[in-house]
């Protein structure tokens, strides 16, 4: 085990704590600029956010996005990344990048992937040849990508798996693989390696993993293995259990969540960072995320609705032309949705802006010590025409917020 503190390319400035819940406001200082937390990271899988240029992504206020190590390792490949000088230059992005380790994609996307102590064995999707992703190779790829935050290779299995022995093996292997990642990481003074807490829905296993990961003193800590079909009540218990144990002076990242209600609850439970493909993916199906819930603008009821996608939204899509925006209407999105990709692009612009705006408002509420009121107002609006989920009521009640 490597316990010595290594150089870090990260500074974490904790600025406020909610006096009722566990919500926190902070600033993360990274090599490509500061990032205010809590925050949502859009997912630019292949060094591109589907439907947005880097300039349009910048306009949403995004200062940290996610790239996928597995996909970039396949194409353009490590040699091209080394030649151009990393993913920032490849995609023309001047701000921060977080990369996942690539392991999750191999296990979830590829047939016949097999995990051993050595690494993840799989067949190349290009020519079917056998390949191996080890912790060392994952670090090498992420060093070539040049991401500001890089994730350890971990052993990921479905949270709902009934195989307790396999879950324990995955948790313990993730700790061992972290040690290998730390040893293989070439540029700790330029890139920040985050550990990933595993353990399924077993709270004792999660506690054990937290304690082991904390000993390794990585610049930040992720809670992984969630959003895998588990009940939301179980998800909340895992997050609550982990954040109780995690150090106050490090950022906390929950991997793979993007529904607004999940994020508002997770912030109350003490988490800082989130990512998910859902806001961009759902845009491609004609869905707009709004403060009143998700609107499917492919529905005929919007054919003569000449209002903006969301009233009072300040994104480029929704702002009037007089205010420097595009002045796009719901009727126009309805007209485009079935035939033209530009409709998906416009909704992507809106949805990403909406999530980032939600995070900015959450942060401001924490700074002003009114996060309980913020959460109450969010749920009253978002679920105005339907019942608030019981899991959210229970989770927030557990940290002193009554809905």
Predicted features, each with a name:
Residues 2-29, 35-44, 48-51, 154-161, ...:
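C-terminal extensions of enzymes
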Residues 2-3, 172-175, 184, 188-310:
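Glycine-rich phosphate/ribose-binding loops and adjacent secondary-structure elements
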Residues 33, 65, 100, 142, ...:
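Conserved, mostly hydrophobic/aromatic
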Residues 138, 170, 174-177, 181, ...:
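Alpha-helical packing segments of well-folded alpha/beta enzyme cores
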Residues 1-187, 295, 300-303:
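Non-catalytic, usually N-terminal nucleic-acid engagement modules in DNA/RNA processing proteins
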Residues 146, 178, 182-185, 217, ...:
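Structural signal for hydrophobic packing residues in well-ordered secondary-structure cores
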Residues 159-164, 220-227, 342-344:
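Glycine- and acidic
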């Amino acid at each position: 085990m490597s316990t010595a503190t290594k150089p870090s390319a990260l500074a974490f400035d904790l600025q406020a704590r909610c006096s009722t819940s566990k919500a926190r406001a902070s600033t993360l200082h990274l090599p490509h600029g500061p990032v205010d937390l809590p925050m949502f990271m859009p997912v630019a899988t292949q060094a591109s956010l589907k439907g947005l240029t880097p300039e349009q992504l910048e306009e949403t206020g995004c200062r940290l996005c996610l790239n996928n190590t597995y996909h970039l390792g396949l194409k353009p490949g490590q040699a091209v990344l080394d030649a151009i000088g990393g993913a920032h230059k490849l995609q023309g992005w001047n701000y921060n990048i977080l990369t996942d380790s690539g392991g999750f994609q191999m296990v979830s996307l590829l047939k016949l992937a097999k995990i051993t102590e050595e690494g993840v064995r799989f067949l190349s999707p290009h020519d079917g040849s056998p390949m191996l992703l080890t912790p060392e190779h994952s670090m090498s790829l992420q060093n070539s990508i040049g991401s500001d935050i890089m994730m350890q290779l971990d052993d990921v299995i479905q949270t709902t798996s009934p195989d307790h022995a396999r879950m324990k093996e995955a948790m313990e292997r993730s700790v061992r693989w972290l040690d290998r990642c730390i040893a293989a990481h070439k540029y700790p003074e330029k890139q920040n390696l985050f550990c990933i807490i595993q353990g399924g829905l077993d709270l004792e296993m999660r506690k054990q993993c937290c304690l082991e990961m904390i000993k390794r003193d990585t610049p930040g800590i992720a809670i992984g293995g969630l959003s895998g079909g588990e009940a939301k009540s179980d998800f909340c218990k895992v997050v609550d259990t982990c954040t109780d144990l995690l150090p106050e002076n490090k950022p906390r990242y929950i991997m793979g969540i993007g529904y607004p209600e999940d994020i508002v609850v997770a912030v109350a439970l003490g988490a800082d960072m989130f990512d998910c493909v859902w806001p961009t993916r759902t845009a491609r199906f004609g869905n707009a995320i709004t403060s009143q819930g998700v609107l499917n603008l492919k529905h005929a009821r919007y054919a003569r609705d000449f209002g903006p996608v969301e009233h009072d939204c300040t994104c480029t899509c929704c702002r009037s032309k007089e205010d420097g925006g595009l002045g796009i209407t719901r009727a126009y999105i309805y007209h485009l949705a079935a035939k033209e990709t530009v409709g998906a692009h416009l909704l992507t612009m809106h949805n990403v802006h909406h999530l980032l705006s939600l995070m900015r408002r959450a942060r401001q509420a924490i700074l002003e010590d009114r996060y309980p009121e913020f959460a109450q107002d969010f749920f009253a609006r978002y679920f105005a025409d339907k019942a608030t989920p019981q899991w959210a009521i229970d989770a927030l009640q557990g940290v002193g917020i009554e809905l």
